[in-house]
Amino acid sequence: MRIAVSACLLGEACRYDGRSKPCARVQELAANGHELVPVCPEVAGGLPTPRTPCEIVRAPWIGSVEAPAADDGTPSFLTSEPHRESNGRSGETKHGRSDSASRDSKARAANERSWAILDASGADRTAAYARGAQAELARAKEAGCELAILKAKSPSCGSGEVYDGTFSGTLVPGWGIAAAAFRDAGIAVIDETADFNRLSRM
């Protein structure tokens, strides 16, 4: 099986701190006949190594992390209901349109403004992360990868939980932008803490 793997787990020094995060359990899969394809969305997106750490920062109105993918390709973990400001009259926005009428027209804009990937200095790195996610997804698909083992908790690669955007070490349910893109494209995603026993025998 061809497996896309976060390059830092394979020993490549591409993390934000300029180091690697080698995982022997992941590396041993190659000895069991699996072909490991290294990926690093941050580097593919043009970010330097080392770099200022980043986290996904969400607006208060962010929706469910399990919401379906948006039509414009926004990863499903980032889709949300639009934020609407009330004019005090039930069912209407401040512009006089009903909530139901304004929902569809504002949904796409909400997807764009309800989240961002910021570094610890406040700089917006969303474009680089999105660019890298799509580049590595394309490479994984071209290689025929059926599975991705991606670094836990990362704003690119986390699957199931990520840091909450406060740079305090707090975790919240969610997906990294690349992990969500892989998942939405039909590539199964796990992290390095998963049980590889069954996979090792495949």
Question: What residue ranges belong to the model's regions?
Answer:
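Internal, conserved structured core segments that host functional sites
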Residues: C145-V162, T166
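Short, well-ordered beta-to-alpha junction loops that form the rim of enzyme active sites
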Residues: C8, K151-S154, A194
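Divalent-metal-activated hydrolytic enzyme cores
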Residues: N32, E42-A44, D72, W115-R139, ...
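Short catalytic/ligand-binding loop motif for oxyanion handling, primarily in non-cytosolic enzymes
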Residues: A13, L47-P48, S156-S159
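Short hydrophobic alpha-helical segments enriched in small aliphatic residues
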Residues: D72-G73, R84, G88, G96
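Short, surface-exposed acidic-centric catalytic microdomains
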Residues: K21-T79, A101-L118
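Extreme N-terminal starter segment of soluble prokaryotic enzymes
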Residues: M1-I3
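Short N-terminal binding/cap micro-motifs at the start of the first secondary-structure element
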Residues: G11-G18
